Amino acid sequence: MAQGLVTFADVAIDFSQEEWACLNSAQRDLYWDVMLENYSNLVSLDLESAYENKSLPTEKNIHEIRASKRNSDRRSKSLGRNWICEGTLERPQRSRGRYVNQMIINYVKRPATREGTPPRTHQRHHKENSFECKDCGKAFSRGYQLSQHQKIHTGEKPYECKECKKAFRWGNQLTQHQKIHTGEKPYECKDCGKAFRWGSSLVIHKRIHTGEKPYECKDCGKAFRRGDELTQHQRFHTGEKDYECKDCGKTFSRVYKLIQHKRIHSGEKPYECKDCGKAFICGSSLIQHKRIHTGEKPYECQECGKAFTRVNYLTQHQKIHTGEKPHECKECGKAFRWGSSLVKHERIHTGEKPYKCTECGKAFNCGYHLTQHERIHTGETPYKCKECGKAFIYGSSLVKHERIHTGVKPYGCTECGKSFSHGHQLTQHQKTHSGAKSYECKECGKACNHLNHLREHQRIHNS
């Protein structure tokens, strides 16, 4: 007998019941293909070994190996059956000046306990999370998971796209990325016709139509369509933020957010719009920006029919109908529909203005205001009126301008029924009914109900 047996379990990948249930048929087929490739690699080993043994595989053994592989390759697509591997691979044996292998694999078919039960190639007895990363202490239940995780620390990205030279840590990421260049979207939703590059994206998308939210938080009961959304949400309860920026110390709950954040320091904007040349830190921002040019608004409110360019805009809008304001300020008790609004509001109390203009040094309490301000320096006016061609720095300015052409006056006075195209015009008008005069002259104390009236009055003193 040869010493130091290499069992098939050393290269096999096992799935738990829960993990297997999450795989679609294409992913399960991929699993079988990978496992069979491993079988083939083991059979065809021709490596040097310190072990010498004169026993050779017989022709009958080799025939059994090849026949078994062909048989399993043909029949493994049946997910209603389980296949187990019995036998071991001995280390390469030396004989007649070359190295050969001795391996007998017998596939045994047995009925599955239920449809979709994961194949168990070998029952392992590792303790849960027994593979620990020496860099950050994070633990994993399987060795291959640790190997994949360590690439985050080393920065290793061995899989490079030939089209754009972008590199990836894992081969499946490259495969998915390449569909961007080919434009391939083979997975189509039967309800709305929207197509996707990946089957998993279609499964998640279908939950929009069905309303299914299978991932529920045990702490607060909130449910989510996707597992990663639940994982991210749970970090709000635990306060866990594993990924820290070495430049500024800011921490993040997800690694991709850290990667995007680092581009703020480096100035890198790899995603460029082909229509106007504007570049972005992340790809999702480019996709959303393109809708300015196309006019696409794919997210529609079922209550009022209003459509939006982003799904988070729709989610925020829907709170108007429900009246939900779950985010409350601990300082003053003011409540907000959205968490981001609360964060911005809290800066009023703290005086924090973290967003600084590199041109003039002016600081702002939210990034959106800085983005708008920077257009003053660049002269960029991305919002153009289709009627007259006039362009604006801000989208809100375009919306107000378009009312000149449409004649829309959405702000109506409840006292007299008079309508206005702008909210501030209604506010000023309502002072006529209330008698409020909020603009007072510092010279003589006279009060006016409109700011422009006060300015006209002040000319008397200046003259």
UniProtKB/Swiss-Prot annotation:
It comes from the Eukaryota. GO terms for biological process: regulation of DNA-templated transcription. There is a cross-link at K109, K400 (Glycyl lysine isopeptide (Lys-Gly) (interchain with G-Cter in SUMO2)). Its main location: nucleus. Keywords: DNA-binding, Isopeptide bond, Metal-binding, Nucleus, Repeat, Transcription, Transcription regulation, Ubl conjugation, Zinc, Zinc-finger. SMART domains: KRAB, ZnF_C2H2. Testis specific. One of its GO terms (cellular component) is nucleus. InterPro entries: Ikaros_C2H2-ZF, KRAB, KRAB_dom_sf, Znf_C2H2_sf, Znf_C2H2_type. Gene3D superfamilies: 6.10.140.140, Classic Zinc Finger. CDD domains: KRAB_A-box (cd07765). GO terms for molecular function: DNA-binding transcription factor activity, RNA polymerase II-specific; RNA polymerase II cis-regulatory region sequence-specific DNA binding; zinc ion binding. Belongs to the krueppel C2H2-type zinc-finger protein family. This is Zinc finger protein 331. The lineage of its organism: Eukaryota, Metazoa, Chordata, Craniata, Vertebrata.
